[in-house]
Amino acid sequence: MVKSAMKIVILILFVLLIRVESKRNGYPDISDGKSSTCRTTVEDSEEDFCVNVCKSIQGRTGNCCLGTCFCFDLPDEQKIVDVMDTTIEYCEWDEEEEEE
């Protein structure tokens, strides 16, 4: 009985200690708590610029949302700028609309 209880405790601890790699969306913290402002270059539109910014920090893609580059599927170690949840929801919704 004690051995099986110990096995259960060890199993629970093991499960809790497993680090799960998750992806998240947001405005990446590029420098000093600020994200990258959308801009065009000779080669890129605003959208292409943001895609390049996001991919350079291991994001899946990005777009220009409310004047700033918003990235999708950023790695956990990438800092993101704190913004209201409604802003994040709007930018995520905007991406879903583009995919349809």
Swiss-Prot record:
Q: According to the lineage, what is the superkingdom? A: Eukaryota
- Cellular component GO terms held in the UniProt record: extracellular region
Keyword annotations for this protein, in alphabetical order, are: Disulfide bond, Ion channel impairing toxin, Neurotoxin, Secreted, Signal, Toxin, Voltage-gated sodium channel impairing toxin
Gene Ontology terms, MF aspect:
sodium channel regulator activity; toxin activity
Query: Which subcellular locations apply to this protein?
Result: Secreted
Signal peptide positions (record): 1-22
According to UniProt, the tissues expressing it are described as:
Expressed by the venom gland.
Query: Where is this protein primarily located?
Result: secreted
Q: Spell out the InterPro entries in the cross-references.
A: Scorpion_toxin-like_sf
Coiled-coil region list? none
Q: Locate the LCN-type CS-alpha/beta domain: which residues?
A: 24-92
Q: Does the keyword Signal apply?
A: yes
UniProt domain comment: Has the structural arrangement of an alpha-helix connected to antiparallel beta-sheets by disulfide bonds (CS-alpha/beta).
| Function as written in the Swiss-Prot or TrEMBL entry | Putative sodium channel toxin.
| Family affiliation | Belongs to the long (4 C-C) scorpion toxin superfamily. Sodium channel inhibitor family.
Q: What is this protein called?
A: Putative sodium channel toxin Ts26
